[in-house]
Regions:
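PRPP-associated nucleotide enzymes
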Residues: 2-9, 14, 21-46, 50-153
């Protein structure tokens, strides 16, 4: 295999980490994949951490110890999350959403992947430290949000 350049390593690291949120990948895994030294991969992870922090793309965390490595946690910056939730609240306050019996029409919102994904990431962010084993929902309309939260956890 030819020598793998840094930009190629960064692309693959980003893809693998973001495809499996909250999964800890050992540096040895990436060393074997790229044929690179741990020190080189540590530098790559540092670069990605800086970029993710600068652009609010989530958090890359290094985990120390025998089972350590690096993991990606999707996080929406607080300011962006508050703006999103404010906009969602405004939408939900529309009188046209009120159904007979005092119910609220949500089907259109809960079928929009970009909205449900953000909702799931925001909810998951509140539970990262608790390390939950599963996510439950009480009603079928909550399944998309629970699925997105579970994916982030």
């Amino acid at each position: 295999m030819d020598r793998i350049r840094r930009n190629e390593r960064l692309a693959v690291l980003t893809k693998q980490l973001t495809a499996s949120p909250n999964h800890i990948f050992t540096l040895s895994h990436f060393c074997d994949l790229f044929g690179a030294a741990k020190s080189t991969l540590s530098e790559d992870v540092d670069i990605l951490q800086d970029v993710y922090n600068a652009f609010g793309l989530g958090r890359l965390e290094t985990v120390t110890g025998a089972a350590g490595g690096v993991r990606y946690r999707p996080v929406i910056p607080r300011k962006e999350a508050v703006a999103f939730l404010d906009e969602l609240c405004q939408e939900l306050q529309s009188p046209s959403r009120l159904l007979p019996g005092g119910f609220l029409y949500l089907s259109d919102i809960l079928s929009m992947p970009d909205i449900v994904r953000k909702m799931g990431i925001i909810i998951a962010g509140e539970f990262y430290d608790a390390q939950p084993d599963f996510v439950l929902t009480m009603e079928t309309k909550g399944i998309p949000v629970a699925l997105m939260a579970a994916q982030s956890l």
